[in-house]
Amino acid sequence: MTAGLLRFDEPVGATPRASLIVLAGRGEAASVYTRLGRRLSADAYRVTVVPDVTRDPTHTAALVRGLIADSDPAPVVVVGSDAGSVLALRLASEPGSRIAALVTAGLPVNTSIEVDAAALIEARSACPVHRVVLADRDAVDPLALARELPAELRLPHADDVTVPVLAVHGEADVVAAIAGAESYYADLADGRLARVPGGRHDILNDVTHRSVAATIVLFVEELRVGAPTIAVTAPESVEVFAQ
């Protein structure tokens, strides 16, 4: 395993269902996504996490292309957070890419803010467990989000991204305002936007992390086998919608 990467495999005895490659954002070690990796791998996905894509975008892009080529089983879904979303979109726009679909989170259309480290933790997540991770200087560069994206990481034209895209974005994201991301996603050939009320920038690790992970699982399963038909009924004695 290449230094800095983390891998989470399916449970022993389970048949792997898909390969997910998670691309971390500005200043993030792969360990920032340990909780997400464990949760998704428990559902029999093979998950590989790539650290801070901004450290060396050209090298990281080549690394991820290799991971995509070697991934087994298909489908290969790339999950990007912050700057990782930009790289994911760029890779999916390349001719001949094996990427079957994307999940993008906190897409930074507006690429820099001016704020101190303490305020950035507040802006990133309301989850107390994740805030402990954010305070770890070995896992997160506290001021990385105040830096602009490297020149190599610019959004591709939406027309060049033809794979399905699940975009997850917090409505309270002050690092990357949802309005800018919405306008980009609206131009995608096959995009869907999951808006998270009250959600902050680290939407994969915010207080709604369980629901967000479940949304990703449903998206990948739909990609694999089609939209499920699930009938939900309530006993006659239960008033589902009380007046």
What positions do the PLM features span?
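Short alpha-helix in the alpha/beta-hydrolase fold that links the catalytic acid
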Residues: L36, V163, A177-A186
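Primarily recognizes the serine-hydrolase "nucleophile elbow" in alpha/beta-hydrolase
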Residues: I68, D72-L120
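Catalytic nucleophile-loop/oxyanion-hole region of alpha/beta-hydrolase
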Residues: G27-A30, V50-P75
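Short, surface-exposed "cap/lid" segments of acyl-processing enzymes
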Residues: T2-R55
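Acidic catalytic loop of the alpha/beta-hydrolase fold
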Residues: E171-A176, H201
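Catalytic active-site module of serine/aspartate enzymes centered on a nucleophile-bearing elbow/loop
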Residues: R192, P197-Q243
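Active-site nucleophile elbow and catalytic-triad environment of alpha/beta-hydrolase enzymes
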Residues: A139-A158
